[in-house]
Amino acid sequence: MALLDASDPTHAAPALSALDLGDKRELRILREGQKNTVWAFGRTRRLFFVTGHARSGTNWIAALLMRHPSIYVDGEYYFQELKRGFDAFRHEPYHRAIREPVRTVAESCFQDTVRLCIAACAIHHPDADWVGDRTPRPLEVFLPGAPHFVITRDGRDVLVSLSILEIAVAGPVYQRFAKCPALARLREEFLKDKEFFKKNPDQLLTSETFTRAIAHDWAAQVRHDFDTIQKIHAGEIDASVFSITYEELHADPERHRARMYQFLGLDPAKALPLTVESETLPGFRGDNHSSDRRKGVVGDWHTYFTDTAKAWFKQAAGAELIRAGYESSNDW
């Protein structure tokens, strides 16, 4: 893959030969103008990000955005993993990269990697003016000036949805507590009967360590995201942000997707309609506990929460539930 650093998009550059795209189809960093802009496959593209906690609706936001012909959003890239590596590279006092000019060069290289990786996916949508990443993660600005969509969902619904998925696929959160007897028992029961939690909803949140961990992680991300959004609004961080809750989007997807297009400077009238096939209408058909497209409803936590689970959640995330506006007190 050949790349060229140039501010002149007409300057000839080697092609992406591995993809056999022709002489004019390359990726190039543009050093002038907006920092979230890149030259990709014959034209400039602008880059954006969709973030939120896992099981909060980042996939849905992406699907809604892609109903507009000028938007393509792919993922998940998990650039935060790469960022940790670059930060470690520049952290230790005996690392040369802690001092200039290597420090600035390393940051520039990280940002260039983000730009080029996202822009490379524009090959799948040649007409896209905007190309994005939809990784579920805390809000962190990797490209100065880039627009960010941040979605927040009731942590109790997140807990239910993520618990079912993690137990079903033995995901990374499950693996953290796989030695917990209560959690191992739940997975055994699920593997024997994929309808186990539908038949026994009071059993889902019976592993205290697992339940508290997910609630704690959700609370930590809510705190971080809200604080970061405040800094963006105050001008302390160079970015723009569109924040929305899953519940708002669920109640009126047409209104809010129009606002999302306008946030990127696009005409909502050009967007395609929402359809069941594109998975852009609220909720999903059925309730398949083996699928990551399980249900998508609001308030599903009422079915699964016991008094014990409520107590665990309030202790781990009650303050953040109130801060996010889902409750006015812990008396729920």
Where are the regions that the model predicts?
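Glycine-rich phosphate-binding loop used to anchor ATP phosphates in small-molecule kinases
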Residues: 113-141
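Conserved phosphate-donor/acceptor-positioning beta-strand/loop module used by diverse small-molecule
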Residues: 144-165, 313
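Short catalytic/ligand-binding loop motif for oxyanion handling, primarily in non-cytosolic enzymes
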Residues: 56-62, 80-83, 139-142, 156-161, ...
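PAPS-dependent sulfotransferase catalytic core
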Residues: 1-119, 125, 168-189, 291
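PAPS-dependent sulfotransferase catalytic domain
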Residues: 31-35, 42, 160-163, 167-259, ...
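The conserved 3'-phosphoadenosine-5'-phosphosulfate
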Residues: 85, 231-307, 311
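C-terminal accessory extensions appended to soluble enzyme cores
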Residues: 302-332
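Hydrophobic/aromatic beta-strand patches that form the interior of the parallel beta-sheet core
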Residues: 48, 72, 147-150, 242-244
